[in-house]
Amino acid sequence: MKRYPIAASRLTVEAGGRRLLEEVDLEVAAGEWLGLIGPNGAGKTTLFRALLGQVSSSGQVTIEGATNPNRRQRAMALAFVPQRPVLPPAMTVAQYVLLGRTPHISYLRSESDEDLAAASDAIEALDLDEEKDRELQTLSGGEQQRVILARAIAQEARTLLLDEPTAALDIGHQLSVLSLVDRLRKERGLTVISAIHDLTLAAQFCDRLLLLYQGRVVAEGSALEVLTERNIGAFYDVRSDVLLDGDGVRAVLPQRTSEEIETPIPPRVSAP
């Protein structure tokens, strides 16, 4: 029988008289990588916040067998990487990674040897030993993303929630970060739920996709089942070519239509 460390039933979030999330049902198996896709405003970040208990919601959330757990229970089970995390510029890598131990440290004590060991292990796992004494402001975008992941790993939660983990990275660093997440998932038996805008990367890395549109689940399944030209046209308002190979979806190529072309770019004129 499959174990679902993360599950939700009829999960609904309302704000300002609007439903941001509407009766979402969710089951994520242990060790699975679930990709959340959908256009901007579809409800991906709201779903993360509802799972974390950061917004008021109705319906049922089950995490590691606990139904509608309190925020501390969720913090112990879920490590969240937001799309734009705050990085205190003068803080060192080691200090920032240690913040991942916050759910384990009570108000009346400082970090223990166990906390320090967990942070050190995360730094080593993300290959950050040489950077651990550097200030965050001196790091490149790719290095910062590894530090953010190290903080999540130091938390020792069984599930990672990643909200656009490759935002603002070039394609090389996007592949590097997602490959790193996949390695950590397999080595440490982690479950991953991530929001990904790039549909080709979502197809290549995620075991299963959940397509959200206006707060509702409109498609769910493998990349082959979800990333159809019909779905992309209906929910992204984009015509596309979906390239397939023997393993399923290989790439999603949006088509530029004539309506999008406004003014021809004039030819470059060389200086005399």
How should each PLM-predicted stretch be described?
Residues 135-139, 143:
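Conserved ABC ATPase signature
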Residues 66-80, 84, 89-91, 108-113:
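ABC ATPase NBD coupling module
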Residues 235-272:
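ABC ATPase nucleotide-binding domains
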Residues 160-164:
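Catalytic Walker B motif of ABC-type/P-loop ATPase nucleotide-binding domains
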Residues 37-39:
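The feature captures the beta-strand-to-loop junction immediately N-terminal to the Walker
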Residues 113-131, 156:
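Conserved ABC ATPase "signature" region
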